[in-house]
Structure formats: C-alpha cells, structure tokens
C-alpha cells in the first residue's frame, strides 16, 4: 500500500467482481468496507466473517447513473450545478509545453491515474504515481508547495519501505500488521521523541540499526520515472525542485499561472516532460 498510515476508516472500491483471491487479500487488510458490482459465493462467505461479521460488504449496480444536476444548501442558499462527469484520460495530455515531449505509455497511464485520484481528493492536492499505482498524495493543504512536500514525503516513505534493512526488520512475536506499519513509519523518521523511541524498541525482537541520512539518500536515488498530477497550476518553481528530489519525471497540471514560464524552465532544467491539461480538478 502507498500510505499504510492512512488506512484506518478506508473503504475499498472495486470495478469488477470480487473473487476469492481478492477477498483473501481484503480479509487481512485494514478497512471498514468494500463496494463492488458483485462477489463470488466464496468471496462473500469469507468477507462476511471479517471483523466478526461487522465488515461492510456492499454491492452496487454498475449501470447506476447519478442525477445530472447536484445541489447543496448552505445557510438557506441553494447552489445547483451540473454533476462533474469528467473522465480524465490521455486526451488531456496532448499539450506538452516542455522541451522534452516524450511521454512513454507507462507515464501516460500513471498520469491518468494521478488525475483520476485528484478528481476525488480534497483540494488543494498533488498526487504521485508509479507503476500503475498511487504512491503519495498531498491533500487538503492551503498552499501548493505544502501539497507537493506532503505527497513527496509519502512517496519517499513508500520507496524506503522497500529497503533491504526495512524488509529485514525482526518484529517481536505477536506484533500485528497495523502495529508493524506504524513501527516502520517511526523507524524511518528522524524526529521521534524519547518516549516514542522507547515504545518503538519494544516492538522488535532484535533492535535494528537506524538508517542513516546518507543511506536513505542513496536508496532514494533509485526512485525514478514518477508521474505527478496537480489539481491546479503551480505558482512557483519550488514545487518542481521538490518533486525532482523524489524522482518525478512526468507532470500534468492545468497551467494558467502568471509564472508558467518559470515553472516550464525548471522542468526543462531537469529534463522533465510536462503537459498542460487546461482542466482544474478541484474537489471540496
């Protein structure tokens, strides 16, 4: 998982029938429920036992279409507008504004995944994607750079979790999955309090040596080809500078900033390819 620290309260949405292998994965994952167009009998039987029968299993009609108009009432005022039925796809990646015009098939896939994620993520938001999955999301921030920093730090943690030292951590007997996830997150942090460090050590059968800053930096050099999507334009080049540190090579954003030229210049300096979609993906 990209952000295992945020799994509590999660729901899983699946676009196809849930089979037994999928249900076996879900049965061990932290989530509050699953929604899908169908379930095999074996999958439904297994999921009905999760959380002592309290796990939410919902079947949705795949042909359902919500109303064309949606409305919200605020302090007695009713706002009505057309439903956002935009389906982000590769057609939004045609306007490549950088010197590097190359978007490999895998990058197109990842950029589309990033845009779809942004459509349903609390604004302001930035999304990192790689190998067909989201690896970091910065959501609900008040500035674009904070979105980028948050998404980048999550992407870094996602990649650091694959470090041999992390994969070789020896946990004490009986330490459950969620506690392991929390422990790995703390193990990779450099700002633990003394109390946190004491509690962390209790979770290991063998106390591990912390990864040094240089060891982390060296490992993160292997993070490359990352796709980044932003739900609105980048107002300053600092977003590009931070994104580059976390392996970003491809970017999609709406464009429209008075400083677009400086942002493009930064992308060109790093050899990035950036497309202007012309579409903001705000979600409030």
Regions found by a protein language model. Name each.
Residues 1-250, 257-284:
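ATP-dependent carboxylate/acyl-activation modules
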């Amino acid at each position: 998982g990209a952000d295992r620290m945020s799994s509590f309260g999660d729901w899983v949405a699946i676009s196809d029938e849930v089979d037994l292998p999928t249900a076996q994965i879900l049965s061990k994952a932290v989530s509050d429920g699953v929604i899908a167009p169908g379930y095999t009998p074996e999958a439904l039987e297994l999921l009905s036992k999760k959380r002592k029968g309290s796990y939410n299993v919902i079947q949705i009609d795949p042909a359902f279409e919500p109303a064309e108009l949606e409305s919200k009432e605020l302090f007695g005022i009713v706002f009505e507008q057309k439903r956002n039925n935009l389906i982000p796809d590769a057609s939004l990646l045609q306007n490549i504004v950088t010197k590097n015009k190359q978007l490999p098939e895998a990058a197109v896939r990842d950029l589309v995944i990033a845009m779809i994620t942004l459509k349903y993520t609390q604004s302001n938001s930035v999304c990192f994607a790689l190998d067909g999955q989201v690896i970091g999301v910065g959501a609900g921030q008040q500035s674009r750079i904070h979105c980028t920093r948050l998404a980048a730090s999550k992407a870094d943690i996602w990649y650091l979790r694959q470090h041999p030292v992390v994969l070789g951590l020896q946990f004490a007997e009986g330490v459950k999955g969620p506690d392991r996830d929390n422990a790995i997150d703390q193990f990779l942090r450099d700002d633990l309090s003394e109390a946190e460090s004491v509690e962390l050590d209790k979770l290991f059968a063998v106390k591990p040596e912390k990864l040094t800053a240089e060891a982390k930096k060296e490992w993160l050099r292997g993070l490359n080809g990352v796709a980044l999507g932003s739900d609105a334009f980048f107002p300053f080049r600092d977003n590009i500078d931070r994104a580059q540190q976390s392996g970003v090579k491809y970017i999609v954003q709406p464009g429209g900033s008075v400083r677009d030229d400086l942002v493009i210049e930064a992308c060109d300096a790093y050899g990035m390819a950036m497309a202007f979609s012309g579409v903001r993906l705000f979600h409030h």
